[in-house]
Design a protein with these regions (language model features):
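Nucleotide-activated donor-binding/catalytic signature segment of Leloir-type glycosyltransferases, i.e.
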Residues: 205-230
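Acidic donor-binding loop of glycosyltransferase active sites
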Residues: 233-257, 270
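A charged, aromatic-enriched C-terminal amphipathic alpha-helix characteristic of glycosyltransferases
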Residues: 294-298, 311-338
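Conserved acidic donor-binding segment of nucleotide-sugar-dependent glycosyltransferases
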Residues: 286-297, 305-311
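Donor nucleotide-sugar binding/catalytic pocket of nucleotide-sugar-dependent glycosyltransferases
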Residues: 115-147
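Glycosyltransferase donor-sugar binding loop
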Residues: 38-42, 190-206, 221
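Conserved donor-binding/catalytic core segment of Leloir-type glycosyltransferases
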Residues: 118, 149-170, 176-183, 191-192
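Short hydrophobic beta-strand element within catalytic cores of glycosyltransferases
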Residues: 262-267, 271-274, 284
Length: 338
């Protein structure tokens, strides 16, 4: 049996790409010979290092011919509907595209060849279904929760996310500004910003470094999966400002579509305090498995309350670890292969 995979964003090494390699792994485990379309085979090592997934059973080829000759084709959409030719065609939306003319007659004709449309969250599904007139299914991304363990905790606040300024910005500058206020009282804490710098960074990284001058802020560029796991294990709190300042109804693509890094942090007992928008609301139960915030001052005040309230950090950390287990890889493979 042969399976084909296409993702035009592979070299960005983000959450959607983590989803893609998990699909490849699931197909290999199901007995398929898997081909991923990409212009260079060197991407394989980069994907393995970033996501900690063995891709030894996966081939990288220049053209999967839109699934022609394959039993299964998994295609990550860039907003368009492709003409796919495999026996079974799966179309995946990792971005909530809107106002792209999704209901044209041509798209409706192309959709006849699609067996299943998969979204990464209910947030994405709601927008995709409305835009294209379809009924997609939600399969949450897989998270390597069994590989992520709590270690001896340090006074670290962590954020993991790309530094790219393309499409969806991660707002690391907002986190630095909030940390400056936080550190006036908590001088022994450190903010760590870790993420990929491969695509679309421009001069943003230098601006962040200048903004952080004089404060205990550490920036880690393109860490490996092993490094990220270590950071999760030692950090006490996870911050995110993705979606801040964005009108989610007008620009849903700019808020967090799911939030794999939040689940990874939770697996390590690192308490998330994340912006109240998009997929984050499906992951974090406010006050139970972390906190959601809307105004910048809430990010700081909720963090201070978490730290100062005796026993609260440990209590919520235990709940986050339990909550993260529903996103494990075994669950993903079962749902994907159904």
């Amino acid at each position: 049996m042969r399976a084909a995979i296409y993702n035009p964003y592979l070299d960005t090494l983000g959450g959607g790409e983590r989803y893609t390699v998990a699909v490849a792994s699931a197909l290999v485990n199901a007995g398929y010979k898997v081909d991923i379309e990409w212009k260079s085979k060197s991407i394989k090592k980069r994907l393995e290092e970033r996501f900690g997934i063995d891709l030894s059973g996966v081939n990288f080829v220049r053209d999967i011919k839109r699934g022609d000759g394959y039993e299964v084709c998994f295609w990550v959409s860039d907003g368009s509907i492709p003409v796919l030719r495999a026996r079974k065609n799966l179309l995946h939306f990792q971005v909530p595209f809107h106002d792209v003319g999704g209901r044209t007659l041509l798209n409706k004709m192309k959709l006849f060849r699609i067996n299943k449309i998969i979204c990464n969250s209910h947030f994405t599904k709601e927008i995709i279904d409305k835009e294209y007139g379809v009924n997609s299914v939600v399969i949450y991304p897989p998270v390597s929760v069994s590989k992520i363990k709590a270690k001896r905790k340090q006074n670290w606040i962590l954020f993991v996310g790309r530094f790219s300024q393309l499409t969806q910005v991660k707002n690391q500058d907002v986190l630095i500004k909030a940390f400056k206020k936080f550190s006036k009282e908590f001088t022994d804490w450190e903010l760590i910003l870790a993420g990929g710098v491969e695509v679309g960074v421009g001069d943003y990284l230098e601006k962040l470094k200048k903004l952080a001058e004089g404060y205990p802020v550490r920036i880690i560029e393109s860490p490996s999966f092993k490094e990220i796991v270590s950071l999760y294990g030692q950090s006490k709190v996870f911050w995110s400002a993705v979606g801040f300042g964005i009108n989610a109804k007008k620009e849903p693509e700019k808020v967090e579509h799911f939030g794999i890094s939040v689940v990874e942090a939770m697996a390590a007992g690192t308490v998330p305090i994340v912006y109240n928008a998009g997929g984050y609301k499906e992951i974090v139960a406010d006050g139970e498995t972390g906190y959601l915030w809307k105004k910048k001052r809430e990010l700081v005040t909720k963090t201070i309350n978490l730290i100062k309230t005796r026993g609260l950090l440990i209590e919520i950390a235990e709940r986050t670890k339990a909550a993260s287990r529903i996103y494990d890889e075994e669950r993903f493979e079962q749902e994907f292969n159904d």
